[in-house]
């Protein structure tokens, strides 16, 4: 009777409870069992409480229970029927399904995150491209307007320079025409000077050829005026030299062009020293009251010297934009 009662009581106990009772009968602690089986104390505790660790497969759990049973001297055949009915096996079977659903949910969330990231990236690239295009278009429009203004000013300058050219040609014609009678009169005046020592010839010449003497006298009278015209024309180079002398000014602005370039130069008084298009291999010398304000359409096409020193335009060349700078007396360009 006692044997049957003990057998029924053992069947009523779970696997974990039977292992715990056997351990206590042998006087072993959970720490001692864990050290002998090379397990964690938490794993031994879960086995005794009939819990299936989430990170432990059912195959390993069965192996740990068998090792635990051999340690506490419980036959494995008595535990195998109970292992089939215990919750740890069912939990082990359900765990992979849960992990699969979690992985699927995580993958879906990562997909949404990646889509949002690509969307933000495309928006940033689109905004950057739109901003660059607007800036480039604005620069092109500004260069076009400046070129139109320069062409209009060139046309006005050409229309105004036509009468100036005609007046200069007429002045040159008037200046050159008196020179021929001056030379002839000079020769005529020299011939009487040679024949002057012959007193006997003078009455005959006066009596025979009075018209020639009249011509000589009339030609001799405008000779001072003719001789004064070259003297008056002689100061013209000095006037031209006076015009070019400002190039020696220490505040002179010297520009050499390696390509076609539009520019506008204004001095401190607001006077436009130059506004128009300069061609390749051209140079320009300007003088005025500092500081100078410059607006250059193609900074890479011009080399500027101010006060004998080159002006740095590299920052405008790198950005490929219209250069707006001010040259003061200390030669410190500022945009």
From Swiss-Prot:
Residues 165-205, 217-239 have a biased composition (Low complexity). Residues 1-111 are cytoplasmic. Residues 30-49 bind DNA. One of its GO terms (molecular function) is DNA binding. It is a single-pass type II membrane protein. This is Cytoskeleton protein RodZ. The keyword Phosphoprotein does not apply. Residues 133-335 are periplasmic. Belongs to the RodZ family. PROSITE patterns: HTH_CROC1. One of its GO terms (cellular component) is plasma membrane. Residues 19-71 form the HTH cro/C1-type domain. One of its GO terms (biological process) is regulation of cell shape. Keywords: Cell inner membrane, Cell membrane, Cell shape, DNA-binding, Membrane, Signal-anchor, Transmembrane, Transmembrane helix. Cytoskeletal protein that is involved in cell-shape control through regulation of the length of the long axis. CDD domains: HTH_XRE (cd00093). Residues 148-164 have a biased composition (Polar residues). Its main location: membrane. It comes from Escherichia coli O6:H1 (strain CFT073 / ATCC 700928 / UPEC). InterPro entries: Bact_Cytoskel_RodZ (IPR050400), Cro/C1-type_HTH (IPR001387), Lambda_DNA-bd_dom_sf (IPR010982), RodZ (IPR023690), RodZ-like_C (IPR025194). The helix-turn-helix (HTH) motif in the cytoplasmic domain of the N-terminus is involved in the formation of spirals to maintain the rigid rod shape. As this protein is anchored in the cytoplasmic membrane, the HTH motif may contribute to protein-protein interactions to form the RodZ helix, which is localized beneath the cytoplasmic membrane. The C-terminal domain may be critical for determination of the rod shape by probably interacting with enzymes required for synthesis of the peptidoglycan layer, including PBPs in the periplasm. Residues 148-244 are annotated as: Disordered. The chain crosses the membrane at residues 112-132. It is found in: Cell inner membrane. The keyword Cell inner membrane applies.
